[in-house]
């Protein structure tokens, strides 16, 4: 059985764009190393893309978070830095209009054989990472789901810690590097 790495929304707008925050750029190298590790082991890699249209501000999310970001076709929608160079045509890609990906959930449920483990990295820990980790755990309840704390972050350190704590309560393992 293969392992699965899900790179969640490591896009320009979340790193140094309209919703970027200090420290998000520091995840580039650890995430790149993780992708290379999985690729060298011939494991499976998937990417999620937060994907909005020009009418974003008219959506429920846009009314609650009135900051245009990750507009399809705009530079902010693209993967950030070195991560953009590491995606391959054979990787799975899930564009999502909201925090969690229903398509990812369905794909995980249909995966046969199931994955040995599912690991998530990327942004933002307390929004899209937690949403997709919960979906992964729901889709594959017998598969270990892992979030690498060194490869995720939030604009608010307190919310990052709370997200990791909530995930632990849902039996999602948080890797913490000391």
Task: Describe each region flagged by the PLM.
Residues 1-93, 146, 161, 165-168:
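Active-site acidic carboxylates
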Residues 34-35, 130-139:
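Histidine-anchored nucleotide/phosphate-binding helix
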Residues 40, 112, 138-140:
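Short, conserved loop/helix-junction motifs that constitute active-site signature segments
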Residues 73-126:
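Internal catalytic-core helix/loop-beta-alpha segment
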Residues 119-123, 144-157:
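A short glycine-rich beta-strand->turn/loop micro-motif centered on a GG-aromatic cluster
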Residues 136, 152-164:
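Structured adenosyl-cofactor binding patch, chiefly the S-adenosyl-L-methionine
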Residues 171-174:
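A glycine-rich helix N-cap at a beta->alpha junction
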Residues 177-178:
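Conserved small/polar residues in nucleotide/adenosyl-binding loops
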């Amino acid at each position: 059985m293969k392992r699965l790495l899900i790179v969640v929304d490591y896009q320009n707008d979340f790193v140094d764009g309209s919703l970027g925050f200090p420290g998000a750029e520091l995840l580039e190298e650890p995430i790149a190393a993780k992708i290379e590790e999985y690729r060298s082991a011939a494991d499976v890699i998937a990417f999620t893309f937060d994907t909005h249209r020009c009418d974003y501000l008219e959506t429920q999310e846009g009314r609650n978070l009135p900051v245009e970001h990750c507009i399809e076709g705009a530079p902010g929608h693209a993967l950030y830095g070195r991560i953009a160079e590491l995606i391959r045509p054979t990787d799975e890609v899930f564009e999502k209009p909201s925090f969690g990906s229903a398509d990812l959930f369905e794909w995980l449920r249909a995966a046969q054989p199931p994955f040995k483990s599912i690991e998530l990295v990327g942004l933002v820990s307390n929004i899209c990472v937690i949403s997709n980790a919960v979906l992964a755990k729901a889709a594959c309840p017998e598969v270990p789901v892992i979030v690498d704390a060194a490869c995720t972050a939030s604009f608010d350190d307190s919310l990052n810690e709370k997200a990791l704590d909530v995930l632990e309560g849902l039996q999602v393992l948080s890797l913490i590097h000391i």
